[in-house]
UniProtKB/Swiss-Prot annotation:
It comes from the Bacteria. Belongs to the UPF0352 family. Pfam families: DUF1414. HAMAP family: UPF0352. The gene is yejL. This is UPF0352 protein YejL.
């Protein structure tokens, strides 16, 4: 069943493009980009989510990330 979001595709795509532009501007390699984005996720969870919900949110995020990974052999 498809997920229904309260955010428009345009909002998501615009924010994604801006974040990618920052990483490209700094010529951040993939490992640094992943470290920074991971730290950002951790910071958001720790500062914006009630402590009782943090583990569940982190688990849900991890599952969503894993399910969105494309397993083709391109790289």
């Amino acid at each position: 069943m498809p997920q229904i979001s309260r955010y428009s595709d345009e909002q998501v795509e615009q924010l994604l493009a801006e974040l990618l532009n920052v990483l490209e501007k700094h010529k951040a390699p993939t490992d640094l980009s992943l470290m920074v984005l991971g730290n950002m996720v951790t910071n958001l969870i720790n500062t914006s989510i009630a402590s009782a919900q943090r583990q569940a949110i982190a688990n849900s995020f991890a599952r969503a990330l894993q399910s969105s990974i494309n397993e083709d052999k391109a790289h």
